[in-house]
Amino acid sequence: MEAEIVRRSEVTGLRREVEESSIGRGDCDGDGGDVGEDAAGFVGTSGRGRRDRVKGPWSKEEDDVLSELVKRLGARNWSFIARSIPGRSGKSCRLRWCNQLNPNLIRNSFTEVEDQAIIAAHAIHGNKWAVIAKLLPGRTDNAIKNHWNSALRRRFIDFEKAKNIGTGSLVVDDSGFDRTTTVASSEETLSSGGGCHVTTPIVSPEGKEATTSMEMSEEQCVEKTNGEGISRQDDKDPPTLFRPVPRLSSFNACNHMEGSPSPHIQDQNQLQSSKQDAAMLRLLEGAYSERFVPQTCGGGCCSNNPDGSFQQESLLGPEFVDYLDSPTFPSSELAAIATEIGSLAWLRSGLESSSVRVMEDAVGRLRPQGSRGHRDHYLVSEQGTNITNVLST
């Protein structure tokens, strides 16, 4: 309770100071009392009515009163502080203090580290300038927004273009960026005391504008990103022609059953003879379930040549051999044995049929005539019985 009374007494003293300063700025007609009464009435109604609001730049006296009130009462309860400043609202007092009068503000130009932090934070939070301002002590959200719109947005766009060119993707759309104007409202930033920070270009003695270090660093950064994008594109682009490396596969060179692995030239007569004996070979393979390896290939590249040269190479390499579709006999002896077996089987079948016929003739000559007649009668009677059974059914 006592603290509240002390605050009210301090506010009353500040009001009197404001009234005295207003009376000192009265008309030259000598009607100082009327001016003082008007000022007193104006102070009394400043926090209640909106028709008495003051819009425009803050004066030096208003800045001093606001600084003194914040120093005594703290940076809180802005509506209560605004009652001591005629025509100013609590929001206006808060923005004026946070953006201009706070002694903890950093008024120097943004450093490269701060620029990188702003770009990284904007990629995460977007246009939430109050959240980004919490990451940079001494920088206000309004200052960060103005710096982004004036310098960093174009730099970020150029960086994204270079990155997209390097990755081969489409250029990012600019619709997500903040399109607000770089000029702040007069109530927030304008001041007659010159509180806001304004960067001006350096002018050389010849009268030409010299680029600042910030612009030089931006140009160097853009050139660097472009160079990195081009090199990255060269690294990621696939080669125009794919050249496979030759290597050994699962195929193995197949040697002959009889002998040496040296290739020899295939003769035309041998090829014809192998085609004639292909049917017999298939028969033998089915009988004995054996897999024969042919001695010659179908490309004509594995037969002996007096010069020792090859006429044709395999598609799989010099170590591989392309064989015929119809395999040949592994040896001439096997063909002779097969022929002999076939002739013996034919002779055996002929002998068996002739011996059966001779035996039947001998039995017919030895059988008597009576028995033959009795047998014929029995056969006829049996056939008649069978016919009657069929007709009855």
Swiss-Prot record:
Q: Which GO terms describe its molecular function?
A: DNA-binding transcription factor activity; transcription cis-regulatory region binding
Cellular location of this protein? Nucleus
Q: What residue ranges does this record give for the DNA-binding region?
A: 78-101, 129-152
UniProt entry keywords in alphabetical sequence: DNA-binding, Nucleus, Repeat, Transcription, Transcription regulation
The protein's induction, as recorded, is:
Slightly induced by salicylic acid.
Entry GO CC = cytosol; nucleus
What start and end residues bound the annotated signal peptide?
none
Is Electron transport included in the keywords of this UniProt record? Answer: no
State a single Pfam family of this protein: Myb_DNA-binding
Could you tell me where the Basic and acidic residues compositional bias lies? 1-19, 221-238
Which PROSITE patterns does the record associate with it?
Answer: HTH_MYB (PS51294)
Q: Where is this region: Disordered?
A: 1-57, 185-274
Where are stretches of biased composition, namely Polar residues?
263-274
Residue ranges annotated for the HTH myb-type domain, each copy included: 50-105, 106-156
Main location per the UniProt record: nucleus
Q: Which InterPro entries match?
A: Homeodomain-like_sf, Myb_dom, MYB_TF, SANT/Myb
What name does the UniProt record give this protein? Answer: Transcription factor MYB1
Organism ancestry:
Eukaryota, Viridiplantae, Streptophyta, Embryophyta, Tracheophyta
